[in-house]
Amino acid sequence: MKFLNILTLAFITGMASAAAVPGGTTTNDAASTLDNLNNKRSVCGQLCFNNKDCGGPCPKCNTKEGVCVKK
Protein backbone atom coordinates (compact mmCIF):
# COMPACT_ATOMS: atom_id res chain seq x y z
CA MET A 1 0.00 0.00 0.00
CA LYS A 2 2.85 2.40 0.79
CA PHE A 3 4.35 1.78 -2.64
CA LEU A 4 1.04 2.71 -4.29
CA ASN A 5 0.85 5.93 -2.24
CA ILE A 6 4.40 6.90 -3.22
CA LEU A 7 3.71 6.10 -6.87
CA THR A 8 0.48 8.12 -6.81
CA LEU A 9 2.23 11.07 -5.17
CA ALA A 10 5.00 10.99 -7.78
CA PHE A 11 2.43 10.86 -10.60
CA ILE A 12 0.39 13.77 -9.21
CA THR A 13 3.54 15.84 -8.64
CA GLY A 14 4.69 15.16 -12.18
CA MET A 15 1.35 16.15 -13.65
CA ALA A 16 1.21 19.33 -11.56
CA SER A 17 4.69 20.42 -12.62
CA ALA A 18 3.92 19.68 -16.29
CA ALA A 19 0.73 21.72 -16.05
CA ALA A 20 2.69 24.66 -14.62
CA VAL A 21 4.53 25.17 -17.93
CA PRO A 22 1.97 26.99 -20.14
CA GLY A 23 3.88 26.77 -23.41
CA GLY A 24 5.28 23.33 -22.79
CA THR A 25 8.99 22.69 -22.75
CA THR A 26 10.29 24.71 -25.67
CA THR A 27 13.89 25.62 -26.37
CA ASN A 28 15.03 29.17 -25.75
CA ASP A 29 16.44 30.69 -28.92
CA ALA A 30 17.27 33.98 -27.19
CA ALA A 31 20.84 35.17 -26.84
CA SER A 32 22.86 34.18 -23.81
CA THR A 33 22.76 36.20 -20.62
CA LEU A 34 26.24 37.55 -21.33
CA ASP A 35 25.14 38.79 -24.77
CA ASN A 36 22.10 40.47 -23.21
CA LEU A 37 24.29 42.25 -20.64
CA ASN A 38 26.72 43.40 -23.33
CA ASN A 39 23.84 44.80 -25.40
CA LYS A 40 22.46 46.70 -22.40
CA ARG A 41 25.86 48.30 -21.70
CA SER A 42 25.58 50.37 -24.87
CA VAL A 43 22.33 52.05 -23.78
CA CYS A 44 22.38 55.62 -22.45
CA GLY A 45 20.57 55.99 -19.14
CA GLN A 46 21.34 52.45 -17.97
CA LEU A 47 22.01 52.06 -14.24
CA CYS A 48 25.70 51.86 -13.40
CA PHE A 49 28.08 51.91 -10.45
CA ASN A 50 31.35 52.43 -12.33
CA ASN A 51 32.61 52.81 -15.91
CA LYS A 52 32.82 49.01 -16.36
CA ASP A 53 29.01 48.88 -16.45
CA CYS A 54 28.82 51.25 -19.44
CA GLY A 55 29.94 51.01 -23.05
CA GLY A 56 29.15 51.86 -26.66
CA PRO A 57 27.95 55.42 -27.28
CA CYS A 58 27.67 56.10 -23.53
CA PRO A 59 30.93 54.85 -21.98
CA LYS A 60 31.00 57.11 -18.91
CA CYS A 61 29.16 56.47 -15.65
CA ASN A 62 27.73 59.54 -13.96
CA THR A 63 28.17 58.38 -10.36
CA LYS A 64 25.96 61.13 -8.91
CA GLU A 65 22.94 59.99 -10.94
CA GLY A 66 24.09 56.38 -11.37
CA VAL A 67 23.43 56.22 -15.13
CA CYS A 68 25.56 55.83 -18.27
CA VAL A 69 26.08 59.06 -20.20
CA LYS A 70 27.90 60.24 -23.32
CA LYS A 71 31.40 61.67 -22.85
UniProtKB/Swiss-Prot annotation:
Subcellular location field: Secreted
Principal location class: secreted
Disulphide bridges, residue numbers: C44-C58, C48-C61, C54-C68
Keyword Secreted tagged: yes
Signal peptide: 1-18
A GO-annotated cellular component: extracellular region
Assigned keywords, A-Z: Disulfide bond, Knottin, Secreted, Signal
Family: Belongs to the UPF0499 family.
Domain notes from UniProt: The presence of a 'disulfide through disulfide knot' structurally defines this protein as a knottin.
Protein known as: UPF0499 protein ACLA_083080
Source organism of the structure: Aspergillus clavatus (strain ATCC 1007 / CBS 513.65 / DSM 816 / NCTC 3887 / NRRL 1 / QM 1276 / 107)
